[in-house]
Design a protein with these regions (language model features):
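Transmembrane alpha-helical segments and their cytosolic interface motifs
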Residues: 109-139
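Cytosolic-side membrane-entry/anchor segment at the start of a transmembrane helix
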Residues: 1-37, 109, 160-173, 180
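Hydrophobic alpha-helical membrane-embedded segments
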Residues: 26-78, 155-159
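Hydrophobic core segments of alpha-helical transmembrane domains in multi-pass membrane proteins
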Residues: 32-41, 131, 143-152
Length: 180
């Protein structure tokens, strides 16, 4: 997944670098929409890569799962059952599968990684709305609202997935700790 993200970002950058001068020269409305859409999508990909890198440098997958932020809330289990998370979670891609691989990592490390991944996606959700502030300067409200909102929803799925998996992992970790 990491290679696909980086490759997609490179292609978006090339597309933006090609479409922007064409729009500047022609002023064509269709090229403008294409340029704005590519530019905003490029922003979303670059921002994701940057947020993930920065949070990883700061946290190193060592978040405190006992923090109130990461603890399971009373409503969550019912909410996840309503969303049927168990049925679709296996189809969601992982940016860095080795981070969650039980043959390479301890359960405690994986729990820390779920906390960190949650933070990454929550920050991304907020930053996904930032392009909306550029609408008065760029126009393209429909394209910007659409890409920003869809981006936020996509990251909400990843937050849900981390929060869904963590309580089970914590229980496994606590059982291992009791055996020691």
């Amino acid at each position: 997944m990491k290679k696909k993200m980086i490759l997609t970002t490179v292609f978006l950058f090339i597309g933006f670098a090609i479409s922007l001068p064409i729009f500047i020269v022609t002023g064509n409305a269709i090229i403008e929409i294409i340029t704005i859409t590519i530019g905003v999508t490029l922003y979303h990909f670059l921002m994701r890569l940057a947020v993930g890198t920065i949070v990883n440098l700061i946290m190193k997958n060592k978040a405190n799962h006992k923090s109130i932020w990461f603890r399971e809330k009373n409503f969550e289990r019912k909410f996840y059952n309503l969303l049927r998370v168990r049925k679709w979670k296996k189809y969601i891609p992982t940016y860095s599968p080795d981070t969650f691989d039980t043959s390479q990592k301890t359960v405690k490390e994986i729990v820390g990684a779920t906390c960190q991944a949650e933070i990454v996606h929550e920050v991304i959700m907020v930053l996904s709305l930032l392009p909306i502030a550029a609408i008065p300067f760029l126009g393209g409200a429909a394209a910007i609202f659409t890409t920003s909102f869809l981006s936020m929803l996509i990251d909400a799925v990843f937050v849900i997935l981390q929060r869904y998996n963590r309580p089970m992992l914590v229980r496994v970790m606590e059982r291992f700790d009791k055996l020691k």
